[in-house]
């Protein structure tokens, strides 16, 4: 799997969807950092969260299981090589649906965070949308509902502070190209996502959950 993400690394570093947007602004706001705040950015991908937080003076360590993403530390989200409560904030953006075990990853986030955890990911919509996501990208494991996220964070000993859903517009051609989706699969994906698509079929709206929790 790491080799797959090594191949995709540059596309995610330059992806406009990942590099900006009101969702990224909100994630940064909810991290609530100041100069010297320590942050662990898990599954950093293109490093966009880390860049924004560093601009605010935070001390950010990035971790990703893919060497091609050029993280500070190479490790999966489920097994993070850091001490308990060793970072003020743990943040994870647009990656959890690829994790082998989201519950294990959330337990790690809660173990390492001294203050809060902020997560952004595609929210579960229905099985039809999940089918489209997996057809587009076999590394997609599963998206969770807001209730599932709340339950996991609470079970890990955290208190949910904020939660909101952002409807992220995704251009089909760009979205499919980013994962080298075979041309033969693209019509079926468009068909599955028709209920969420624009009238002209050029884009679709993906519900994105942003949720923040704190240590009591």
Predicted regions: what they are:
Residues 1-34, 48-52, 167, 173-177:
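Conserved class I S-adenosyl-L-methionine
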Residues 40-79:
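Class I SAM-dependent methyltransferase SAM/SAH-binding core
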Residues 46-48, 161-216:
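Conserved Class I S-adenosyl-L-methionine
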Residues 91:
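A conserved beta-strand element that flanks and buttresses the S-adenosyl-L-methionine
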Residues 94-95:
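Short catalytic micro-motifs in class I SAM-dependent methyltransferases
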Residues 103-117:
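A short glycine-rich, Lys/Arg-flanked "PGG" loop and its adjoining helix->strand segment in the class I
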Residues 122-140:
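Short, glycine-/aromatic-enriched active-site segment of Class I SAM-dependent methyltransferases
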Residues 142-157:
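Short alpha-helix
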């Amino acid at each position: 799997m790491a080799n797959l993400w090594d191949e995709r690394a540059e596309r995610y570093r330059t992806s406009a969807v990942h590099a900006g947007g009101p969702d990224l602004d909100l994630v940064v706001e909810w991290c609530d950092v100041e100069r010297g705040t320590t942050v662990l950015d898990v599954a950093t991908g293109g490093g966009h969260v880390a860049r924004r937080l560093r601009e605010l003076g935070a001390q950010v360590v990035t971790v990703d299981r893919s060497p091609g993403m050029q993280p500070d530390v190479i490790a999966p989200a489920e097994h993070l090589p850091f001490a308990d409560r060793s970072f003020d904030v743990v943040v994870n953006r647009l990656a959890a649906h690829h994790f082998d075990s989201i519950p294990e990853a959330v337990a790690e986030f809660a173990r390492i965070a001294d203050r809060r955890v902020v997560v952004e990911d595609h929210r579960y919509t229905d099985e039809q949308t999940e089918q489209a996501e997996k057809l587009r990208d076999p590394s997609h494991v599963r998206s969770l509902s807001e209730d599932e996220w709340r339950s996991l964070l609470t079970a890990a000993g955290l208190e949910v502070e904020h939660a909101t859903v952002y409807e992220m517009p995704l251009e089909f051609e760009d979205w499919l190209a980013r994962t080298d989706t075979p041309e033969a699969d693209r019509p079926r994906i468009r068909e599955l996502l028709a209920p969420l698509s624009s009238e002209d079929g050029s884009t679709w709206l993906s519900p994105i959950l942003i949720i923040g929790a704190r240590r009591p």
